Amino acid sequence: MAGRSSNRSIGTVAMRWHGDRLELLDQRLLPAEEHWIVADGASAVAQCITDMVVRGAPAIGISAAYGVALAARHAGGGDWQAEIKQAIRVLAKSRPTAVNLFWALERMEKVFHACHSLDEATDRLAAEAVRLHEDDLAANLAMADYALEVMNPDKPIAVLTHCNTGALATGGYGTALGVIRRLHEEKLLKRVYADETRPWLQGSRLTAWELTRDHIPVTLNADGAAAAIMASGKVKWIVVGADRITANGDVANKIGTYNLAVLARHHKIGFMVVAPSSTVDMSLESGKDIPIEEREGTEVREIRGIPLAPAGVQVFNPVFDVTPASLIDAIVTEKGAVRNPNITGMRALFT
């Protein structure tokens, strides 16, 4: 593996656990305002996930795990098992595409079913949520190592990224943005080009904010400028995250990712997906099986109440698109990298 730098920051945290409550950094307000929302129960956590107070597949899963822990913490003395089961159901409905959500809830549910009293459930579920959070950070650090092995740069390079895959979207450090952090730590990063990522502007509001805070050189660009940047020869790799990866290596990620993969293939630029193995859903054969969330048209027609389009105009607003495995050069997880992904390579990750 690539050598690990001792000069490392895990980045700005997206959540703070206090045992009886979860604090979530309201990412809808960044970069203008840093405001923390207190979630003191599972329903409050679920609402924060739905409303995109917290976003990013790993962070959603971790938040949901803490939500289950809070359900146990605040359960009544009656049918506490029914209360926790209901909390899990509510959390499962908060975002349909991020498989990490269901993976985290299944992990918490296994612990829950092994508990024989409310006190035991309270202690064990809280400990499991913290462990899940710590495991995610460790996975991000491992993914950065594997990604650098795939890239194998012999001099500083520039990369382009999409959406936000940093500490704000994970348990710390980041997935795709964690790779960028590692390049910077090893003095192998020339510059990051960050797509603004319409319509929620995660690139401009979050990625540019994270990188600027951590003194990592970043240039913000309109989504439509990505092709021109690639054509200029400025970037060597496109590095993105994932919300769900299927058994054949197809990837669901933030809308606009598919565009980048097509452009990267045309310009002969490497296209890398970085995500924890919990994002891989081997029960789905291909990207055609992934449910794609669509959100309200107001997210495209306006920004914070300011009209950008005629009132009532029809809007197509899918949150994700699916990039075929045939356009991906490598999928990197904490278990290793799959180059030119296919079903054989994806299965090998789990053997």
Curated annotation (Swiss-Prot):
The keyword Isomerase applies. The record marks 163 as: Transition state stabilizer. Keywords: Amino-acid biosynthesis, Isomerase, Methionine biosynthesis. Substrate binds at residues 55-57, 95, 202, 253-254. InterPro entries: IF-2B-related, IF-M1Pi, IF_2B-like_C, Initiation_fac_2B_a/b/d, M1Pi_N, NagB/RpiA_transferase-like. Its EC number is 5.3.1.23. Pathway: Amino-acid biosynthesis; L-methionine biosynthesis via salvage pathway; L-methionine from S-methyl-5-thio-alpha-D-ribose 1-phosphate: step 1/6. One of its GO terms (biological process) is L-methionine salvage from methylthioadenosine. The keyword Cell inner membrane does not apply. It catalyses: 5-(methylsulfanyl)-alpha-D-ribose 1-phosphate = 5-(methylsulfanyl)-D-ribulose 1-phosphate. The active site is at residue 243. GO terms for molecular function: S-methyl-5-thioribose-1-phosphate isomerase activity. Catalyzes the interconversion of methylthioribose-1-phosphate (MTR-1-P) into methylthioribulose-1-phosphate (MTRu-1-P). Belongs to the eIF-2B alpha/beta/delta subunits family. MtnA subfamily. HAMAP family: Salvage_MtnA (MF_01678). This is Methylthioribose-1-phosphate isomerase. It comes from Marinobacter nauticus (strain ATCC 700491 / DSM 11845 / VT8) (Marinobacter aquaeolei). The lineage of its organism: Bacteria, Pseudomonadati, Pseudomonadota, Gammaproteobacteria, Pseudomonadales. The gene is mtnA.
